[in-house]
């Protein structure tokens, strides 16, 4: 029929057009993500000798420790060397963990990189992630039965991963938040609600009209009000003793994409606190107590926190004691954040990554450098023009096309060299 489009034309219209630039940009983005997650971890040496590492990339081996067995985690190097052909669960990063590879939890495997390990690592913490299950729904990721596109977000406290729709509070549309604290951890660390009224990206205030739906469809809220201007404990007695005696300097250096020079473990923070190596100010008010004196709302929902929110937490002696009792002293450590870990990885990779072109240039004299740069620019220009023809025509670039390009390029180069005439003065 006249005017009808052929099946090929229809298919061409339906298929998305991806340029070479798009492919290169996507490849670079994936490489940067990999560097961020893996760059801060050693890919050749087992991390066991470092003790409980402040933060590192971790994996769980479903082949060696399937569901029903004791959970175990392995470091990046062991995932390559000892479990290369096994089914692994990628756990992203976790804090204060010591590699389990080859210990008593692995019945038929000895670690190739560090075989002399203790039977168990009693300080390690495990959850359902080590069996490939995540969120309150306890489902795998990716979930073949879940057709709803949803982002998985990691809780900064328990380090479990959650679907955005199961957090009781919708993630900010802009994605402009650094960390999230899940519903269960907000219940356990209820002191954070006083900070949430001032710091959370989606602020929780007494003037909020609606209730945010939580994972079970409920939206409970508790408005805490001061009585006669006096500070209230707001149900925080179970979290910690009364606050507000000696306080420490709360002003911390803001983290602006610079990595922390070292990772402090939870045990390090405990040691610092126990030895009272904290500079105290003269008696002044506790920041948490000041916030609790104001009206704020507690909800059964997750909270989302901005960059550097941890530096705003009170670090007086009573608050530090409370953090220790709740096992969240890491919240006072800016180096504990995933962002700090990722930035360290990126910087380490940038330092280690050598540019072969720059290495070649540095080994040449000035004349050779100029000639090489000119040749490089010629190649770049001609290759761009050559590929543009395929883009304009909508045709696929084949291996033979690239071979033909370089043959023609070399031929042109030989003609230019052969055509040069040298004169002696």
Swiss-Prot record:
<feature type="region of interest" description="Disordered">
    <location>
        <begin position="212"/>
        <end position="269"/>
    </location>
</feature>
<dbReference type="GO" id="GO:0061630">
    <property type="term" value="F:ubiquitin protein ligase activity"/>
</dbReference>
<protein>
    <recommendedName>
        <fullName>Putative E3 ubiquitin-protein ligase UBR7</fullName>
        <ecNumber>2.3.2.27</ecNumber>
    </recommendedName>
</protein>
<feature type="compositionally biased region" description="Basic and acidic residues">
    <location>
        <begin position="235"/>
        <end position="257"/>
    </location>
</feature>
<dbReference type="InterPro" id="IPR003126">
    <property type="entry name" value="Znf_UBR"/>
</dbReference>
<dbReference type="InterPro" id="IPR013083">
    <property type="entry name" value="Znf_RING/FYVE/PHD"/>
</dbReference>
<dbReference type="InterPro" id="IPR040204">
    <property type="entry name" value="UBR7"/>
</dbReference>
<feature type="modified residue" description="Phosphoserine">
    <location>
        <position position="264"/>
    </location>
</feature>
<keyword id="KW-1017">Isopeptide bond</keyword>
<keyword id="KW-0862">Zinc</keyword>
<feature type="zinc finger region" description="PHD-type; atypical">
    <location>
        <begin position="132"/>
        <end position="188"/>
    </location>
</feature>
<dbReference type="GO" id="GO:0016567">
    <property type="term" value="P:protein ubiquitination"/>
</dbReference>
<comment type="pathway">
    <text>Protein modification; protein ubiquitination.</text>
</comment>
<keyword id="KW-0833">Ubl conjugation pathway</keyword>
<dbReference type="InterPro" id="IPR047506">
    <property type="entry name" value="UBR7-like_UBR-box"/>
</dbReference>
<keyword id="KW-0808">Transferase</keyword>
<feature type="cross-link" description="Glycyl lysine isopeptide (Lys-Gly) (interchain with G-Cter in SUMO2)">
    <location>
        <position position="398"/>
    </location>
</feature>
<dbReference type="GO" id="GO:0008270">
    <property type="term" value="F:zinc ion binding"/>
</dbReference>
<keyword id="KW-0479">Metal-binding</keyword>
<feature type="zinc finger region" description="UBR-type">
    <location>
        <begin position="44"/>
        <end position="116"/>
    </location>
</feature>
<dbReference type="InterPro" id="IPR011011">
    <property type="entry name" value="Znf_FYVE_PHD"/>
</dbReference>
<keyword id="KW-0832">Ubl conjugation</keyword>
<comment type="function">
    <text>E3 ubiquitin-protein ligase which is a component of the N-end rule pathway. Recognizes and binds to proteins bearing specific N-terminal residues that are destabilizing according to the N-end rule, leading to their ubiquitination and subsequent degradation.</text>
</comment>
<keyword id="KW-0597">Phosphoprotein</keyword>
<feature type="cross-link" description="Glycyl lysine isopeptide (Lys-Gly) (interchain with G-Cter in SUMO2)">
    <location>
        <position position="252"/>
    </location>
</feature>
<keyword id="KW-0863">Zinc-finger</keyword>
<feature type="cross-link" description="Glycyl lysine isopeptide (Lys-Gly) (interchain with G-Cter in SUMO2)">
    <location>
        <position position="274"/>
    </location>
</feature>
<feature type="cross-link" description="Glycyl lysine isopeptide (Lys-Gly) (interchain with G-Cter in SUMO2)">
    <location>
        <position position="225"/>
    </location>
</feature>
<dbReference type="Pfam" id="PF02207">
    <property type="entry name" value="zf-UBR"/>
</dbReference>
């Amino acid at each position: 029929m006249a005017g009808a489009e052929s099946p090929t034309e229809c298919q061409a219209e339906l298929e998305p057009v991806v340029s070479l630039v798009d492919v290169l940009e996507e490849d670079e983005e994936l490489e940067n993500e990999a560097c961020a997650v893996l760059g801060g971890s050693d890919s050749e040496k087992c991390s066991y000798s470092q003790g409980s590492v402040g933060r590192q990339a971790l994996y769980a081996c479903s082949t060696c420790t399937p569901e029903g067995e004791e959970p175990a985690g392995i470091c990046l190097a062991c995932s390559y060397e000892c479990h290369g052909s096994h089914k692994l669960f990628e756990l992203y990063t976790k804090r204060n963990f010591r590699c389990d590879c080859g210990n008593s939890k692995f019945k038929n495997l000895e670690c190739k990189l560090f075989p002399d390990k203790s039977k168990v690592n009693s300080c390690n913490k495990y959850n359902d992630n080590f069996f490939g299950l995540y969120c309150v729904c306890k489902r795998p990721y990716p979930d073949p039965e879940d057709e709803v596109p949803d982002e998985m977000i990691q809780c900064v406290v328990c380090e479990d991963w959650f679907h955005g729709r199961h957090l009781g509070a919708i993630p900010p549309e802009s994605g402009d938040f650094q960390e999230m604290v899940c519903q269960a951890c907000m219940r356990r660390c209820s002191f954070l609600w006083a900070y949430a009224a001032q710091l959370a990206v989606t602020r929780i205030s007494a003037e909020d009209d609606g209730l945010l739906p939580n994972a079970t469809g409920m939206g409970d809220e508790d408005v805490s009000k001061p009585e006669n201007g006096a500070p209230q404990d707001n149900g925080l007695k179970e979290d910690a003793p009364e606050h507000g005696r000696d306080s420490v300097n709360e002003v911390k250096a803001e983290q602006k994409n610079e990595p922390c020079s070292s990772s402090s473990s939870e045990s390090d923070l405990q040691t610092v606190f126990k030895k009272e190596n904290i500079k105290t100010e003269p008696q002044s008010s506790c920041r948490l107590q000041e916030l609790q004196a104001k009206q704020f709302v507690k909800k059964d929902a997750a909270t989302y926190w901005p960059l550097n929110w941890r530096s705003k937490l009170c670090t007086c002696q009573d608050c530090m004691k409370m953090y220790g009792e709740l096992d969240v002293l890491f919240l006072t450590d800016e180096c504990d954040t995933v962002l700090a870990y990722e930035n360290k990885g990126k910087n380490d990779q940038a330092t280690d990554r050598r540019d072969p072109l720059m290495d070649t240039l540095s080994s040449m004299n000035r004349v050779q450098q100029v000639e090489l740069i000119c040749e490089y620019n010629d190649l770049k220009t001609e290759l761009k023009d050559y590929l543009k023809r395929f883009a304009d025509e909508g045709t696929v670039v084949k291996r033979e096309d690239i071979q033909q390009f370089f043959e023609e390029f070399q031929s042109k180069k030989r003609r230019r060299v052969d055509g040069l005439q040298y004169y002696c003065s």
